Amino acid sequence: MYLRPIFLGIFSFLILTVGRGEMISPLKIPLLMSANFGELRPNHFHSGIDLKTQGRIGLPVYAMDDGYVSRVVVSPWGFGRAVYINHSSGLTTVYGHLDRFAPFIDEIVRRQQYEQEDFSIDCEFAEGEIPVAQGDIIGYSGNSGSSGGPHLHLDIRDTDTQDPMDPQEWLSPLITDDVAPEVRNLVFYTHEGVMGNTTRRMERKAVRASAGSY
């Protein structure tokens, strides 16, 4: 189900201004989603998509394009083990809930953990420190962090602003999806300022006029 949510708030009206270069799939299995971009969570919108890993841990995860590792996070919460890659296109791809990193990243992570004397780390790297090529294995899928089961969380962001973009804009031809969305309600959230005479959420019931029309 390919949802195109309208965000009146946290994401505002994000207009894509960067070119869409050719990206490859981060997984070499048929892509099935377990969560869409923009899904409403208890305290945030879902900033990416969740890709199923056939209920398995340890599938190779591939860099979607040339670039460099700009950030690596290890945490018992959030994305767990995560790799951030900056690309020359002005995009950043984020791969979350990894079971482990590729050896060339893991070596650096372990060194940082020993230096900081802490399991949890959040390290940033400059361009050229950890280069990657499209198709390089950067880690292996897992269930680390705040995850309810094995899957790969994938973000695509604007590097400069870190605004999230819908990964389906790049991957939709590869994602098996034949379930049409059903609109039930439209909910408005304010980000800054006032909406009408209120700053609270407003919800309106969607009335179906005909197939695909509300």
Residues of each region from the PLM?
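Surface-exposed, glycine-biased beta-strand/turn segments
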Residues: 18-92, 120, 126-128, 133-134, ...
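Aromatic/His-enriched, Gly/Pro-containing loop or helix-boundary segments
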Residues: 96, 103-134
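A short secondary-structure junction motif
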Residues: 40, 101-102
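Bacterial N-terminal signal peptides that target proteins for export
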Residues: 1-7
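Hydrophobic h-region of N-terminal signal peptides that target proteins for export
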Residues: 10-20
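Histidine-centered catalytic micro-motifs
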Residues: 149-156
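A short, sequence-level motif marking secondary-structure junctions
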Residues: 97-101, 170-172
